[in-house]
A protein has these predicted regions:
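Metal-dependent enolase-superfamily TIM-barrel catalytic cores that perform enediolate-based chemistry
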Residues: 141-209
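Metal- or metallocofactor-binding catalytic centers and their adjacent structured scaffolds
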Residues: 41-127
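General structural feature for long, well-ordered alpha-helical segments within catalytic domains
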Residues: 64, 89, 93, 112, ...
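Structured beta-strand/loop patches that form or line metal/cofactor-binding pockets in enzymes
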Residues: 1-61, 67
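Glycine-rich, aromatic-flanked loop segments that form ligand/cofactor-binding clefts
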Residues: 111, 117-160
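Short regulatory "switch" loops immediately downstream of catalytic or recognition motifs
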Residues: 30-42, 48, 69-80, 128-133, ...
Length: 209
């Protein structure tokens, strides 16, 4: 099987959420959604890898469409395949995106490349027929991934109409769903108000949570 990328699609959409933290108003934030369309077929369906950029970083449609997607599509298909020629090579695709770029992180550029990179890895795992965590463990570890990871619930954002009771209900709902650690946002109100918000939360959470 010889795999190639047929298309890299990007759309920029508003997050359209009324929440905010100390720095960002998410009602004005956008995000990029990327689809890497391949000619591979798995279980009767064309393989498409999907990626999106994290909230807190704006959509990168301009960079993706004008610089990075064209470089992938202009590259010789064989130059983007792995050594077995039966899957894509994310590292070669990353190198293709970085052609004619000055080395370094450089802010927004890393978001654009990272969003495509996420979609590429999603496609690679689908072509391989494995969950991505298993694929990464097979390639870069002992093939025995830890199936339990530390997670926490981030909440307590600021939004219109929020009161202490709603804040308490929100944070308690995370504990009720099994989270052992929760985090709330601070810095978006006065120090006195933030302290009152923290006190309200501590009334409904156990010590150390």
């Amino acid at each position: 099987m010889s795999v190639r990328i047929l298309e890299v699609r990007e759309i920029t959409r508003p997050i359209a959420s009324p929440i905010r933290n100390a720095y960002i108003d998410f009602s004005k934030m956008t995000t990029s959604l990327v689809a890497v369309v391949t000619d591979a077929v798995r279980d009767g369906r064309r393989v498409v890898g999907y990626g999106f950029n994290s909230n807190g970083r704006y959509g990168q449609g301009g960079l993706i469409r004008e610089r990075f997607a064209p470089r992938i599509l202009e590259a010789a298909p064989d130059s983007l395949r792995d050594d077995a020629r039966d899957n894509l090579d994310p590292h070669k695709i990353w190198a293709a995106m970085f052609r004619n770029e000055k080395p370094g992180g450089h802010g927004e550029r890393s978001v654009a490349i990272g969003t495509i990179d996420m979609a590429v890895w999603d496609a690679v795992a689908k072509i391989e027929g494995k969950p991505l965590f298993q694929l990464l463990s097979d390639r870069y570890s002992d093939g025995k991934p830890n199936r339990e990871i530390f997670v926490y619930a981030a909440g307590g954002y600021y939004y219109p109409g929020q009161d202490y009771k709603k804040l308490q209900d929100e944070m308690k709902s995370y504990v009720d769903r099994g989270y052992r650690v929760v985090k709330k946002k601070i810095g978006g109100a006065s120090l006195d108000e933030d302290l009152r918000r923290i006190d309200a939360i501590m009334e409904v959470l156990q010590d150390g949570q």
